[in-house]
């Protein structure tokens, strides 16, 4: 077993900046892992490394069929001419596509050890999408069995063995598969079969699969996602906790003459201006590009696609560094209606996402819409307010001021002049997403460190506000509340209060 270490340096949501230590150097995560064919390299591996990729994945099963024992003599790094990290798929994709392969798991495991791969995957049986639960259960059982045999089968050559999680849309099986692999001692896990989910636009199911697996994993174990190479799914995969993800999308799209952008793909025939400054897009105009010979056109387009994917990963990394990953994925979600369904999974799992989201950040957060009431930093503040207790009997509630914290605002100064018994009054401001903001804790992040859209929100769409409102009033014994009766948002919640509490307007 390798003594490798996964070191985490920065987190936001379930996403993290980290470092994988391997036999062939360090790899910064999150990392896109381009698929390289071991025999037919259309884009040279050196070019892929030049673009900025330090980890690639190739197929050990195809390597074995084409090179045989010669592969063990040469080693996989010499075969594909790549001196950085290499991950090998043992043939699971072929099992998914064709139903079976002509090699046994122990034989495949020994071959992966022999070719000195850095990351090795046992020969599993992918469940795919739409498989009946009984059959999926058999596949999970088989994969756990061969994974255990592989991990226990003697010494290795320092590889990091990756445990393949199966189960598909059967989340109880995903959980069982994950827990089984963790208990066996795998240092890294990989979630299988998401390609079919993405091809069917089942983004919500994909998100649920990832979250289900992550909840069964120790925080220190990295997670790989098979087949995720679309610029729209990458931010979500990272935000939900995937550290590496492989795909041949850069070449598959190129063969269809599809040009990757930051919000999807465009057919080359439909592009008037290249929205990119990579070496390919600055060399040709779209019309010149379309005139290239077919093979050259595909290869050049594949290189652009690699640059585009690399840029997307780098943007997500920057969002993690800035503490703005939530804002980034919310923006990405609006690129496709089906993709927006992943936001529901994030809001449903805000507590899980909050486990690795810093409670305090250097920069203000942006609150745009109802979805933002579920972002972890906001939820953390709600939890704080739900524990807040005041000895005062009178309560004044106003909209939050533009000056933050609230006790420095002209609005607060005006209240001091308006109420003679001000020292006996509990003052709260409010924000639709953040909820009630007691003036005493209005300087705590993010109450004093946010910007909110100045639009009229529907109070019925803010269950977190309602919960905090109810808990706040049950924890305190106010006999009188002063508020603006023209404030439609606030009026909705005031109606929920008991008749014993006097309601007065201070406007």
Range-by-range predicted roles:
Residues 1-156, 365-392, 398-476, 483-507:
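Non-catalytic, usually N-terminal nucleic-acid engagement modules in DNA/RNA processing proteins
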Residues 66, 130-131, 199, 255, ...:
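Short secondary-structure boundary/hinge segments and terminal tails
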Residues 101, 132-139, 143, 170, ...:
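Residue-level preference for long, well-ordered alpha-helices that form the structural scaffold
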Residues 141-144, 153-282:
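Glycine-rich phosphate/ribose-binding loops and adjacent secondary-structure elements
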Residues 248-341:
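Gly/Ser/Thr/Ala-enriched C-terminal appendages of enzymes
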Residues 339, 343-378:
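Flexible, glycine-rich loop/tail regions that form catalytic "lids" or insertion modules at the edges
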